[in-house]
């Protein structure tokens, strides 16, 4: 379904629910296009607060604050999808008359719940997934063991990110422990994919149905957290194009307005399996900030504001390396001295273990992304803790 609403003029207010680094970088992109940004978040120390024109500090469950926020902005978007269900219902029924909500509440409700997401992909598309089961109690848990066999991964249906909310189970003892410790129920049991690599595609769709895809990229994770992205993925053109087509299919089926990250596995037989969907800017799209004329944040703001979408092209190959926790931040002086490193820091004051503090992009001439040894040499000081070393 196409939305024929007019484009927002400069000076309009973009409302962003969530105050993390994705909201921060979205706000900066909005300012470049002449928009003001109003952040709704629960903490005054969140990264996006520093760059916003207006800020509401309130609980995501505060209906009064949500209503005032909706009345003060021209469009609402989201920097994370794990927003309380009651909040989404209130926005749908009590706030949609005040402003646009992009992407739609339906998109968030579908993608914030693994069961709903997998059911949607199975029923609305022909896109392949790893075998999975819905687990509500011990009986369905036994059926999952029978269907999937060990090992498999047990996951919470909601609030899983950066490796949280899941356990790798190899036997009944580990399974029973995981079933008890993972909350809330219900859970998802999912087969372990013997994958050759992990990929993702950023796809953006406008209010009038125009679709743009950035290049397919390859991702490396370290303890469940994205460590590094290679753009473009060093794969055959056929596989890269297939991954983009999968992302397009999902965006169309969701009637998406805005940007979305689609994470996939490439298995060892050459088949692609969708892993997760994130209807927002995504960590694996940060390479676009320096390797493309229009990055993922520019494209998202353009889409939700009803502006024309340029083509999602890159002028350079790129490595994106996350700066995670106190170990990486201790290297910051050397990072800042390294020629060719383009740092992006998120303004977080405390570097806790596993916390994303920023990222570094490194560019190469188009078509000249190095191999593993060249990547290690390029990253230098940052190569001492990288997924390539696993």
Roles of regions detected by a PLM:
Residues 241-262, 268, 278-326:
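Active-site "cap" helix and flanking loop/linker of ATP-utilizing ligase/carboxylase catalytic domains
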């Amino acid at each position: 379904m196409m939305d024929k609403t007019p484009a927002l003029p400069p000076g309009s207010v973009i409302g962003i629910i969530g105050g993390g680094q994705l909201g921060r970088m979205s706000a900066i992109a909005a300012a470049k296009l002449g928009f003001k940004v109003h952040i709704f978040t629960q903490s005054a120390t969140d990264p996006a607060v520093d760059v916003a024109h207006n800020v509401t500090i309130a609980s995501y469950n505060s209906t009064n604050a949500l209503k005032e926020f909706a009345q003060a902005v021209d469009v609402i978007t989201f920097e994370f999808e794990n927003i309380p269900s009651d909040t989404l219902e209130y926005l749908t029924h009590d706030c949609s008359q005040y402003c646009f909500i992009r992407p739609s509440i339906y998109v968030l409700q579908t993608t914030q719940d693994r069961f709903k997401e997998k059911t949607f992909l199975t029923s609305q598309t022909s896109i392949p997934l790893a075998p999975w089961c819905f687990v509500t109690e011990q009986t369905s848990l036994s059926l999952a063991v029978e269907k999937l066999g060990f090992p498999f991964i047990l996951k919470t249906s909601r609030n899983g990110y950066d490796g949280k909310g899941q356990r790798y189970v190899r036997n009944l003892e580990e399974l029973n422990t995981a079933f008890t410790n993972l909350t809330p129920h219900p859970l998802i049991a999912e087969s372990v994919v013997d994958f050759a690599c992990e990929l993702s595609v950023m796809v953006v769709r406008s209010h009038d149905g125009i679709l743009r895809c950035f290049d397919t990229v390859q991702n490396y994770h370290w303890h469940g957290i994205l460590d590094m992205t290679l753009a473009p993925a060093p794969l055959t053109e056929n596989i890269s194009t297939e991954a983009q087509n999968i992302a397009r299919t999902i965006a169309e089926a969701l009637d998406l307005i805005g940007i979305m990250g689609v994470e996939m596995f490439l298995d060892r037989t050459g088949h692609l399996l969708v892993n997760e969907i994130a209807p927002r800017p995504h960590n694996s799209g940060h390479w676009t900030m320096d390797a493309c004329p229009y990055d993922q944040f520019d494209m998202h703001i353009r889409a939700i504001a009803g502006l024309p979408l340029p083509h999602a092209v890159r002028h350079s190959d790129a490595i994106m390396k996350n700066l995670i926790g106190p170990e990486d931040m201790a290297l910051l002086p050397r990072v800042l001295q390294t020629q060719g490193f383009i740092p992006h820091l998120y303004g977080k004051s405390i570097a806790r273990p596993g916390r994303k503090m920023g990222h570094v992009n490194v560019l190469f001439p188009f078509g000249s992304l190095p191999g593993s040894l060249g990547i290690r040499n390029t990253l230098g000081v940052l190569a001492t803790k990288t997924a390539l070393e696993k």
